[in-house]
Regions:
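Short, basic, glycine/proline-bearing loop/turn elements
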Residues: 13-14, 83-89, 116-120
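A cross-family acyltransferase "interaction/gating" segment
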Residues: 124-173
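Helix-to-loop junction immediately C-terminal to a conserved catalytic motif
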Residues: 5-7, 12-44
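Hydrophobic/aromatic ligand-binding patch that stacks against planar heteroaromatic rings
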Residues: 56, 81, 104, 135-139
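Catalytic core of membrane glycerolipid acyltransferases/transacylases, capturing the structured
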Residues: 33-94
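Catalytic-site beta-strand/loop segments enriched in glycine and acidic/polar residues
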Residues: 105-134
Length: 173
């Protein structure tokens, strides 16, 4: 699968992180396999969780293919980027097509990023998890890697005014 869009997006994201003055503490990146399919099951506390987790996978030389709600793919700016980075659109009313697409990607050796809570937790506590990540792992015979993000809620989350001016925010993945 050709990745023409992912590399320049990574450059832009890294510049954005530098502009924000974010301090990263990536722990356990040795658990991200350098080859073969796997699932990152990620808590969801902020709108930047996907980019933070994707950044954490880069030392393993891997791109994460995230499952994201269809509405993001319908956005005029985000949609082409999401498709170009081979992320997987999830229609919440009919998830079978996205399940099949994720299964196919896992069997092809891709890392899939899933937010099992299904949405951002406004309490910043882990909500009840949906079963899709485990069902995909069983179907593809791949490991599930539990992944926690902390700190992104200080930058941009639900029901809180976005503050991209905050500097030196510590982020742990």
């Amino acid at each position: 699968m050709a990745d023409l869009v992912y590399p320049p997006v990574i450059v832009a994201i890294k510049a954005f992180w530098k502009y924000l003055g974010l301090r990263f503490d990536f722990q356990g990146e040795e658990n991200i396999p350098r080859d073969g399919g796997s699932i990152l099951a990620i808590n969801h506390i902020g709108y930047l969780d996907f980019a933070l987790t994707g950044t954490a996978a880069l030392p393993a030389g891997r791109y994460v293919r995230f499952m994201a709600k269809k509405e993001i793919f319908d956005n005029k700016l985000a949609g082409p980027l999401m498709r170009g980075m081979h992320h997987i659109s999830v229609d919440r009313a009919n998830g079978s097509a996205s399940f099949v697409a994720a299964l196919r990607a896992l069997r092809a050796g891709e890392i899939i990023g899933i937010f099992p809570e299904g949405t951002i937790s406004v309490s910043f506590e882990i909500k009840e998890l949906k079963s899709g990540a485990v069902r995909l792992a069983m179907g593809a015979g791949v490991p599930v890697i539990p992944t926690i993000v902390w700190g992104s809620q200080r930058i941009w989350t639900k029901k809180v005014k976005r503050d991209l001016r905050r500097k030196n925010v510590p982020i742990t993945v």
